[in-house]
Amino acid sequence: ALENNQNHEDQYHGNFGPLWVETYQPILEASKSFLNACKEYGLKKNNDFNGENQEGYGQYQVNIKNGQRFSASDAFLKPVLDRPNLELLTNTLVEKIITSNKKAVGVKIKNKKGTQIIGSTCEIVLCGGSINSPQLLMLSGIGPKKHLMDLKIPLVHDLPGVGKNLQDHLTVNISYKINQLKTFSELMK
């Protein structure tokens, strides 16, 4: 498991990984009032927005450990930064995945030193997020054949699902001015 979820261990969550996940604390009085209002109105409670269903009201899970934000960098990168076979390049753009016989063998990068190709004898981990990952795959010739042909990008591998199924995570934020209760903003002053 990648996550260390303090609230759930099920088919959607693990609790032995390095990435800390917990329900947001503390529950402010204003939040308690909101949760109670949702319940009284008859809305469905959701104890896990990252599980099977995303509808309803409830508290969010967050990446906070000991009161501090705990990022993917904290979980995965910082513990291995001193490895001799790891070099971290900042302010560097990956322009393309280099392939040979449909196997990723390196990346083409650009930074203030110029453009260069970095080879790999092991795996290449692509983590550019929901926008940049499919973009980089398509720039590398991996994606829907017709779309790549329209863009005049040489086809490496026809993979129709690349760039598809992007979904918004819909949420509704409601702001109210309240009296007699401390808000998070007031507590942070």
Task: Name the predicted role of every residue range.
Residues 1-104, 108-110, 173-189:
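Conserved redox-cofactor binding core of oxidoreductases
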Residues 97-189:
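Glycine-rich loop(s) and the adjacent beta-strand/alpha-helix scaffold that form part
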